[in-house]
Amino acid sequence: MEDQPPTEIQISVETRYLPEQSSPEQEHFAFAYQITMQNNGPQTAQLLSRHWIITDAEGHVQEVKGPGVVGEQPTLQPGQRFRYTSGSVLSTPVGSMHGTFEWVSDTGESFVVPIPAFRLAAATVFH
């Protein structure tokens, strides 16, 4: 893996609480997150894998690893973007996610792009 990535992949995240899929009384809080990946660099790159670390408000951690995202391993030309939506279920109304995406450039160089931590929070405060 290269210390300096061969291209720049920008990651942005939007989250949403899903009350219609949640059951707070059963400690079941559903969230959707939309990830946008944009290739702002000079080289084409393909997403190989993802690694998520999901933490609830009580400190319970789930790790998710796998190839690509939502069944795809998109290839992004310079200037291109790819957007997908997925979800996570927590046992608490608040939590966080962070992780990494592993990519390979069109010259065969592997590199990792960090996904900064983002918050998952139910829109309602439960008493």
From Swiss-Prot:
UniProt cross-references to InterPro entries, sorted A to Z: ApaG_domain, ApaG_sf, Uncharacterised_ApaG
Q: Which domain of life is it from?
A: Bacteria
Q: Which protein, by its recorded name, is this?
A: Protein ApaG
Under the heading Gene3D superfamilies, the entry gives: ApaG domain
PANTHER family to which the protein is assigned, alphabetical: F-BOX ONLY PROTEIN 3 (PTHR14289), POLYMERASE DELTA-INTERACTING PROTEIN 2 (PTHR14289:SF16)
Q: Cite the ApaG domain residue spans from the record.
A: 3-127
What does the entry give for GO biological process?
Answer: error-free translesion synthesis
